[in-house]
């Protein structure tokens, strides 16, 4: 019977488990478990999240400050964010430390170079000094680095503002989603508690119906006991009639007929009771199978005993003692059956008491869970109010920070305007210094006879170059384009000036030297002719030659034009033309023009 009680308890637990839902949900705020697509709670939670818009917070930005940043930042890509987050320090510490400020400008310049499609900066390790890294840059890269170094404060503040805004938006959205998720979980818990209460009431009703059925079985058992007692009385009457059997055979037969009818009615009543008991036991499922077996065994025993009793009554004349023994055995079987029925009744009452205790414990547990849930709801409400107050204070601090940032951007705008004006003036002064030096260099290069003739043209070209450079500084706003145009203009002027200097130096002819060489050749010829005249036999004829006319006829017009008009032949040559070449060279006067 101990095994039978365990089976009954197991049956009750199976009923409770089958009635309860199979899906469990997490009570935590930040549960990472996700249900399937068919889960209604997850779908309702997703719908609730879609119905509520995400929190967003736009930072107040001055238009002038934004325009200043757009000149240097093409877009806030991940490279710029990594350059800011790589320092792991705030703008205050970065700006205060010169080394971190230079390294931050290095990272920003590298990002700008990469975005513009140019080769990246050379590698600069974290432990190396920035001075050694800056030596690896050329002039153009160093200029870009200088621009970013001057605007490090503005860029750092803007990046820090965007990072702070994104962090606040993420925290507020997570807070809102967590609150919404907690509210949905509380709704789910409330529905679960309602379902649990309904299940408990259903279990209570089922146990009540089970109690009613057990009472019906008890009443049927009492009826069966009454029938059995009536049957025993009838057997006593039969025994009395058996004593008087000798008196009247007909009365005995009538008694036998009555006994048969009574037994038949008892059997019918017993079968009806057995049918009702079997129906009740079927409804109790597997827990009452043993009861059904015992009742069937009892019915079989009773039917067997009744058949034996009927057979003994047929032979009652000869087997009276055997009939009495059978009746005694029948009484013993009835006593055993009554004991079994009493045990069944006692077991059913114990099962009902245990079920009532279980329901009471379930009710107390549900009440405790509801009280705990109410306390958790109050705590969640307090936390939600506290977070709401914190978010309001954070928003107020953000508004104050935006106002300070706007004022700072206005001051930086004025500072940048002053810086641009000073830079323009310094570039103009630098250009005038360079062109003054260019004037001096041109003067030095054109001081010779070969290049003296191109000095005016070079000065005119230098003035035109200066005018073009000043115009580019005044009317071109892009710094890089200004530098490119200035370098192009200066390069063109230097190329043209060098070409003119080379052409003048290579194409120059010194006509004084040419005239001097021609005169030297003529003097040599005259001396040769004079020496030949002395050796000639016809000395008189030769002496009559007019050498002056010969020189005039022998020289061309071009040579006459190239001769010095102010030069006069010395008297010594006229009187004595036959002289040495060394004397002629010594008397020739190279006067400047």
Curated annotation (Swiss-Prot):
Relate the assembly described in the record.
Homodimer.
Q: Which organism is it from?
A: Arabidopsis thaliana (Mouse-ear cress)
List the Cytoplasmic topological domains: 449-457, 507-593
Where found in the cell? Cell membrane
Signal peptide limits: 1-24
UniProt feature coiled coil, ranges: 156-194, 350-387
Q: Name one GO molecular function term.
A: identical protein binding
Q: What is known of its domains?
A: The extracellular domain (25-427) is sufficient for male and female gametophyte development before double fertilization, but not for early embryogenesis. The cytoplasmic domain (507-593) is necessary for correct early embryogenesis and mediates homodimer formation at the plasma membrane.
Q: What does this protein do?
A: Has a dual function during gametophyte development and early embryogenesis. Required for correct pollen maturation.
Q: What are its GO cellular component terms? A: plasma membrane
Q: What's this protein's name?
A: Protein GAMETE EXPRESSED 1
What is the recorded membrane topology of this protein? Multi-pass membrane protein
Q: Which gene encodes it?
A: GEX1
What are the transmembrane regions?
428-448, 458-476, 486-506
Keywords on this record?
Cell membrane, Coiled coil, Membrane, Signal, Transmembrane, Transmembrane helix
Q: What is its main location?
A: membrane
């Amino acid at each position: 019977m101990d095994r039978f009680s365990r089976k009954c308890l197991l049956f009750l637990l199976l009923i409770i488990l089958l009635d309860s839902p199979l899906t469990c949900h997490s009570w935590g705020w930040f549960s990472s478990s996700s249900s399937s697509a068919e889960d209604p709670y997850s779908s309702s939670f997703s719908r609730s999240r879609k119905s509520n818009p995400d929190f967003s917070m736009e930072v107040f930005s001055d238009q002038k400050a934004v325009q200043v940043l757009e000149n240097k930042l093409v877009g806030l890509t991940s490279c710029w964010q990594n350059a800011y987050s790589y320092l792991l320090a705030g703008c205050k510490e970065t700006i205060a430390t010169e080394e971190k400020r230079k390294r931050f400008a290095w990272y920003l310049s590298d990002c700008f170079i990469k975005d513009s499609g140019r080769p990246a900066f050379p590698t600069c390790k974290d432990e190396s000094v920035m001075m050694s890294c800056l030596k690896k840059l050329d002039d153009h890269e160093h200029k870009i680095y200088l621009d970013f170094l001057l605007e490090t404060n503005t860029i750092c503040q803007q990046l820090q503002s965007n990072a702070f805004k994104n962090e606040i938006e993420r925290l507020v959205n997570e807070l809102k989603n967590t609150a919404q998720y907690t509210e949905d979980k509380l709704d789910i818990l409330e529905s679960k508690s309602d379902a649990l209460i309904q299940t408990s009431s259903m279990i209570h009703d089922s146990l009540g119906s089970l109690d009613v059925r057990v009472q019906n079985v008890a009443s049927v058992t009492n009826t069966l006991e009454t029938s059995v007692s009536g049957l025993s009385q009838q057997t006593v009457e039969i025994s009395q009639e058996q004593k008087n059997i000798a008196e009247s055979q007909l009365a005995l037969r009538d008694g036998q007929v009555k006994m048969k009818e009574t037994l038949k009615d008892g059997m019918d009543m017993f079968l009806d009771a057995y049918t009702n008991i079997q129906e009740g036991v079927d409804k109790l499922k597997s827990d009452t199978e043993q009861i059904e077996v015992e009742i069937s065994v009892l019915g079989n025993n009773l039917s067997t005993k009744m058949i034996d009793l009927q057979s003994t009554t047929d032979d009652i004349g000869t087997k009276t003692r055997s009939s009495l023994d059978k009746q005694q055995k029948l009484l013993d079987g009835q006593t055993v059956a009554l004991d079994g029925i009493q045990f069944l009744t006692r077991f059913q009452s114990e099962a009902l008491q245990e079920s009532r205790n279980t329901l009471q414990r379930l009710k107390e547990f549900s009440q405790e869970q509801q009280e705990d849930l109410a306390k958790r709801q109050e705590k969640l409400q307090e936390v939600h109010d506290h977070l709401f107050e914190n978010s309001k204070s954070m928003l107020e601090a953000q508004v104050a920070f935006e106002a300070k940032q706007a004022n700072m951007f206005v001051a930086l705008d004025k500072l940048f305007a002053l810086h641009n004006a000073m830079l323009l003036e310094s570039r103009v002064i630098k250009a005038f210094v360079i062109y003054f030096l260019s004037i001096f260099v041109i003067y030095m290069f054109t001081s010779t006879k070969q290049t003296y003739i191109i000095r005016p043209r070079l000065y005119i070209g230098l003035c035109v170059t200066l005018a073009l450079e000043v115009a580019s500084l005044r009317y071109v706003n892009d710094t890089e384009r200004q530098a490119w145009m200035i370098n192009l203009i200066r390069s063109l002027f230097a190329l043209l000036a060098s070409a003119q200097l080379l052409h003048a130096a290579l194409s120059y002819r010194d006509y004084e030297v040419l005239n001097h060489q021609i005169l030297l050749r003529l003097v040599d010829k005259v001396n040769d002719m004079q020496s030949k005249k002395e050796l000639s036999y016809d000395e008189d004829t030769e002496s009559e030659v007019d050498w002056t006319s010969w020189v005039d006829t022998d020289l061309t017009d071009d040579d006459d034009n190239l001769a010095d008009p102010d030069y006069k032949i010395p008297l010594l040559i006229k009187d004595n033309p036959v002289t040495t070449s060394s004397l002629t060279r010594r008397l020739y006067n190279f006067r400047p023009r």
